[in-house]
């Protein structure tokens, strides 16, 4: 299983330096959607990481993806949300609510 990444230039450089090879540097929501779809259709990819800000612009693409997509903060910090998507993923997968 490999990890795919969709992010801006700073995120892409960071993950490449960490040794990941399936890294897409995007500049628009359209590019991000296309990259997510390509990674989602790649049988070797098991997890996709993107930034919260990119995720905000491609919510429908993320909702339709078959793979697990984790949104991480970018260099500007986290987006304050009413519901934490990671907590929702864990609750749905494990059945336990994280406090």
From Swiss-Prot:
Gene Ontology BP term (one): proton motive force-driven plasma membrane ATP synthesis
Compartment(s) where it occurs, according to its Swiss-Prot or TrEMBL record: Cell membrane
One GO cellular component, as annotated: plasma membrane
Annotated SUPFAM superfamilies: AtpF-like
Main localization, broad class: membrane
GO MF term set: ATP binding; proton-transporting ATP synthase activity, rotational mechanism; proton-transporting ATPase activity, rotational mechanism
Gene3D superfamilies reported in the protein's UniProt record: ATPase, V1 complex, subunit F
Membrane topology: Peripheral membrane protein
Alphabetical list of InterPro entries matching this protein: ATPase_V1-cplx_f_g_su (IPR008218), ATPase_V1-cplx_fsu_bac/arc (IPR022944), ATPase_V1_fsu_sf (IPR036906)
Keywords: ATP synthesis, Cell membrane, Hydrogen ion transport, Ion transport, Membrane, Transport
Described function: Component of the A-type ATP synthase that produces ATP from ADP in the presence of a proton gradient across the membrane.
Similarity field: Belongs to the V-ATPase F subunit family.
Subunit comment: Has multiple subunits with at least A(3), B(3), C, D, E, F, H, I and proteolipid K(x).
UniProt name for this protein: A-type ATP synthase subunit F
Organism: Methanococcus vannielii (strain ATCC 35089 / DSM 1224 / JCM 13029 / OCM 148 / SB)
Gene behind this protein: atpF
């Amino acid at each position: 299983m490999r990890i795919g990444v969709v992010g801006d230039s700073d995120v892409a450089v960071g993950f490449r330096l960490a040794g990941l090879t399936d890294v897409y540097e995007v500049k628009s929501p359209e590019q991000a959607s296309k990259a997510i779809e390509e990674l989602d259709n790649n049988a070797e990819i098991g997890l996709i990481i993107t930034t919260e800000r990119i995720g905000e612009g491609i919510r429908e693409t993320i909702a339709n993806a078959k793979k697990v997509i984790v949104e991480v903060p970018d260099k500007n910090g986290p987006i304050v949300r009413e519901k934490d998507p990671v907590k929702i993923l864990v609750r749905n997968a494990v059945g336990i609510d994280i406090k």
